[in-house]
Design a protein with these regions (language model features):
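Predominantly extracellular/luminal cell-surface or secreted proteins
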Residues: 72-74, 100-104
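Solvent-exposed strand-loop boundary residues in beta-sheet-rich modules
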Residues: 93, 105-107
Length: 138
């Protein structure tokens, strides 16, 4: 909440009277979020190593706003739980390529769709950048 005041003046022929008017506003907590695509490049079905990629997520929240950034299982989900969804890309006709998104560079913590598996942050009033780490297994 921001507070302030403004001075009021009244002029009359006989003299001047002044008073103070208090001014206030409540700032609602809010956030905006944006990201760039995670592009894995070319997949080789005979490769023995995973394909890795990253994407950035930029969140701007008002100062003090608590935010939880979660990720769904995507447009072509496989079986799995919200905590660790099986994510799949599709080329159509029932053909899928499994991938996963992680919240850490070691690619050991799945970025899920629940509070324990999402990424929490507190707004600072300026943009905060998070990195999402992706992997397509061999």
């Amino acid at each position: 909440m921001a507070l302030g005041s403004a001075a009021l003046s009244v002029y009359t022929y006989a003299g001047t009277a002044t008073s103070t008017m208090n001014v206030s506003v409540s700032v609602a907590h809010s956030c905006s979020i944006d990201s760039n695509p995670m592009a894995f490049g070319t997949y080789d079905g005979n490769a023995s190593n995973a394909i890795e990629a990253i994407a950035t997520i930029v969140s701007t929240c008002t100062s003090g706003a608590a935010a939880l950034i979660t990720m769904s299982a995507g447009a072509s989900p496989g079986s799995g739980l919200a905590e660790a969804p099986v994510r799949r890309m599709t080329a159509g006709a029932g053909e899928y390529l499994v991938y996963q998104v992680y919240s850490d560079a070691a690619r050991s913590t799945v970025w899920g769709n629940t509070a324990p598996t999402g990424v929490a942050l507190t707004g600072t009033g300026v943009s905060q950048t998070l990195t999402a780490y992706g992997s397509v297994p061999p």
